Amino acid sequence: MDTAPDHREPQEQGESRKWYEMTASEFYVYVVAFMCGVSMMMSVNAVFSAPAYIMTYYRYAMQDPEAVPLYTNFWNNVMTYYNLIGIVTSLIMEPLTLLSWFRRIPIKVRLLGGLVILIVEIIVLMVVPARGTSEAGAVATICCTGFIGGFGKSIFESTAYGMFGAFPSSFTSTMMGGVGMSGVLTSLLQIIVKAALPDSYEGVKKQSKIYYGLDVGIQGMTFVALILLRFNSFAQNYFGDLGAVKSKVDAGKLSAEALCHTDEHPTHDKEGRNSSSGKEVPALGEVQTAAAKSEGPDAVEESSWPHEVEGPTSNEILVATAIFSTLRRVKWMFVACAFNFLITLFLFPGIAVGMFPDSKWFSTIAVFIFNVFDVLGRFSPSLKLMWPRSYKQRWIIVAASFARVIFVPLLLLHSYHYIPGEAYGYVMEVIFGFSNGYVGSMALVLGPQSKGIDNDGKRFVAGTLMGISILVGGTIGTVLSIMTQTIRERH
């Protein structure tokens, strides 16, 4: 019997212990969850925080401050192209992470590998200008880094969402808060750097080095923190393979028969008997002595099952988990999350903050306000009063997601100056940012807690599916944004 002091106890939904009531190992896992959230979006935020650098990247790549571009359409829309390449790559790659061959890869390898790829993206952006290349080479570099970032993000994001989806909901909420805090950090730094450094060729170059250096530094610290996580007893109660030992995770209703034959789906009656054989199939991770005792005392000692069997590894549970069955369980939270980010990326940042192109500070301050209230919304599920009162009231989150469509006319009218004034834009960013963080975070937290998600394999897959929902909504929203911006330019 496991007597480790950090053995997990069930927690009420949305409820987390005060930091001073936690063990050191539990608090450390919260810190790692937060750092994973920050690192997840840090590369994208670093690129978007230095738009002047990326939009004139050809000058730095050609090492010529007076260079005139030939591919004007690409450089005028370079941020959109970069974002679209990354999102489409993630949308293609992230579902592949659910395939059985990928799920056999140890969790720690996926986390560290995805993080290394994200670091490589930023290193490439910094190395190419140092070595020098042509404008075509600069275009290829932007496209390649968009692909590299999308590839690394899909691996790191799907694994992180899945892993922390198997922990109590407060860990997912903390990770989501880290995602929002990444935007706050880069926005705050952008304001400071923009005020301190000139917008000259050398000034913009220094700005990019600050943003990219911060990104690599934070992701490097996250890399080290994840390595140390394998020695954390609290984390091993959820994913033992992080420490290269047998997992103590909850196998739920996953049977030994299902684990050995993942392509077969035996049915069981209410008493846990296999309907085809009539035999009881004990759950993995439970004491397996009843069947042996029925054969006599000698059979207990000779049984191939030990008196108390260690649970399967996390990867064994994942391989035995049905994807589409899990998707049916989380479908409404999947839809709510996808539509939430569809609306957000349709309007933000292009439409929501681009209505005053001649203003030096409007877009910078508007993005900062959005990020601050977005992170407040992402942390709000840590307050129990922000949760639906019962399981049946989860429809409120779906309704809130679809209600955000009201921002489309409100922000479009402002972008066309039918509603004048910068103050209106700032107020809208407060509501828009908080609603994005709250709805997105609640959907991501509630998804792995849906009925029928009864073991950690399903919770991991549910968390991964919720991460995919962000990409689905984000891709559609980005495409709609490009179409809208194109129509605006022509008319």
Swiss-Prot record:
GO terms for cellular component: plasma membrane. Keywords: Glycoprotein, Membrane, Transmembrane, Transmembrane helix, Transport. The keyword ATP-binding does not apply. Residues 261-280, 290-309 are annotated as: Disordered. Glycans are attached at N274. It catalyses: adenosine(in) + H(+)(in) = adenosine(out) + H(+)(out); uridine(in) + H(+)(in) = uridine(out) + H(+)(out). It is a multi-pass membrane protein. Residues 261-273 have a biased composition (Basic and acidic residues). GO terms for molecular function: nucleoside transmembrane transporter activity. It comes from the Eukaryota. The keyword Membrane applies. InterPro entries: ENT1/ENT2 (IPR034764), Eqnu_transpt (IPR002259). The chain crosses the membrane at residues 27-47, 82-102, 109-129, 136-156, 173-193, 209-229, 333-353, 361-381, 395-415, 427-447, 460-480. It is found in: Membrane. It holds the Pfam family Nucleoside_tran. Sodium-independent nucleoside:H(+) symporter; transports adenosine with high affinity and uridine with moderate affinity. Can transport cytidine and thymidine. Can transport tubercidin, a toxic adenosine analog. Belongs to the SLC29A/ENT transporter (TC 2.A.57) family. This is Nucleoside transporter 1.2. It comes from Leishmania donovani. The gene is NT1.2.
